[in-house]
Design a protein with these regions (language model features):
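A short, solvent-exposed beta-strand micro-motif common in secreted/extracellular proteins
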Residues: 82-92
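Bacterial N-terminal signal peptides that target proteins for export
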Residues: 1-10
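Short acidic/proline- and small/hydrophobic-mixed sequence motifs that coincide with surface turns
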Residues: 40-44
């Protein structure tokens, strides 16, 4: 009986850990699809929590470029569990543009426009 209670407690704790981790991962899923509608080739994409004063050092495109009219899936593990993020795109002509306050808990697709506007869903 004593071992049964210990086993039941251990299994309950394990179930809570497994389901709690899955729920946490679902809540903090911040991956999204990024569409380039700027008219220019994007050579780098940087993300930053809206409240931060610096961009992440990691270029989300890696060695790739994002040509006009194309899209890419951004799969990242945020170092900050922030809800709102900013995006900085650097273009092949040396210029850049920034867009602000994307709720990555609820947005799954972002289309960047060169005029500083973005469409998201």
């Amino acid at each position: 009986m004593k071992h049964t209670v210990k086993l039941l407690v251990a299994l309950t704790a394990l179930a809570a850990l497994i389901f709690g981790t899955a729920a946490f991962a679902a809540v903090y899923d911040q991956d999204f699809t990024l569409m380039n509608n700027t008219g220019d080739t994007i050579v780098s994409i940087y993300l930053s929590p809206t409240r931060a004063n610096k961009w992440r050092a990691e270029d989300e495109l890696g060695n790739y470029v994002l040509k006009p009219g194309y899209e890419v899936d951004i799969n990242f593990s945020p170092w900050d569990e922030a809800r709102y993020w900013d995006i900085r795109a650097e273009f092949d002509d040396g210029t850049y543009a920034e867009w602000y306050n994307f709720d990555l808990f609820s947005i799954s697709r972002i289309t960047l426009n060169r005029n500083g506007k973005a469409v998201y869903e």
